C-alpha cells in the first residue's frame, strides 16, 4: 500500500516498532527531503515507492501536489493508494501538534512543515479532499492518535460496500 501522508499524521511514529527500530513494522517512511528536487525527482521518488509497495511494504510518501498527481495516474495499476489527512476542524490541534514536533526536534523539515501549515492548512486539506486520489482517510478527533486504526477502519468499511 502507498500512503500519501499529510504532515504530522504520524508517518515516522508508525514506522518505528519501538524507539530506535525502524525496520520491523512493514511500514517505510520514504522521506522526500532526501531527494534532490530536480526535474525528475517526483518520478524517481514515486518509482521507489511503487517498487517498495511491490515488495510488500506499506510506504508513506509526502503529500506534495506533484506526488499526488503522479500517483493518481497509477491507481488503475495500484488500487491501494490512499491519502491520509485531517479534517478542517482539527486545524488548531494540528498546528499545535506540528509546533510541538518542531520544538522537540528543530529540523528544517519540521520548521517548513509547521510554517507552511500555519498559513495553508485549509487550502492543503481542500486540495487533498478534491484531488483525483480515490481512497481518502480523514483524521478526526476520535482517531487522531491512532493512524493504523484509522487506516484499518477505512479499509474495513470499504469491504462492505
Put a short name on every predicted segment:
Residues 14-20, 69-77, 122-129, 150-154:
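Short, aromatic/basic amphipathic alpha-helical patches
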Residues 104-161:
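Small-molecule kinase domains that catalyze NTP-dependent phosphoryl transfer to phosphate-bearing small molecules
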Residues 23-81:
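Conserved nucleotide-sensing/catalytic segment adjacent to the nucleotide-binding pocket
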Residues 1-20:
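Glycine-rich phosphate-binding P-loop
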Residues 73, 95-100, 123, 143:
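Inter-domain helical "communication" segments and dimerization helices
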Residues 76-98:
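Conserved phosphate-donor/acceptor-positioning beta-strand/loop module used by diverse small-molecule
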Residues 37-39, 90-99, 147-148:
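Short, charged, surface-exposed secondary-structure boundary motifs
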Amino acid at each position: 500500500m502507498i500512503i500519501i501522508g499529510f504532515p504530522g499524521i504520524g508517518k515516522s511514529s508508525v514506522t518505528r516498532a519501538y524507539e530506535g527500530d525502524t525496520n520491523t513494522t512493514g511500514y517505510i517512511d520514504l522521506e522526500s527531503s532526501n531527494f534532490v528536487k530536480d526535474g525528475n525527482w517526483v518520478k524517481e521518488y514515486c518509482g521507489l515507492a511503487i517498487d517498495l509497495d511491490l515488495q510488500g511494504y506499506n510506504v508513506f510518501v509526502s503529500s506534495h501536489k506533484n506526488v499526488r498527481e503522479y500517483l493518481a495516474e497509477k491507481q488503475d495499476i495500484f488500487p491501494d493508494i490512499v491519502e491520509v489527512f485531517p479534517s478542517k476542524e482539527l486545524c488548531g490541534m494540528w498546528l499545535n501538534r506540528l509546533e510541538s514536533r518542531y520544538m522537540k526536534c528543530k529540523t528544517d523539515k519540521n520548521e517548513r512543515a509547521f510554517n507552511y501549515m500555519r498559513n495553508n492548512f485549509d487550502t492543503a486539506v481542500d486540495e487533498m479532499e478534491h484531488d483525483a486520489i480515490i481512497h481518502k482517510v480523514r483524521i478526526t478527533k476520535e482517531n487522531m492518535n491512532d493512524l493504523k486504526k484509522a487506516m484499518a477502519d477505512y479499509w474495513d468499511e470499504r469491504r462492505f460496500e
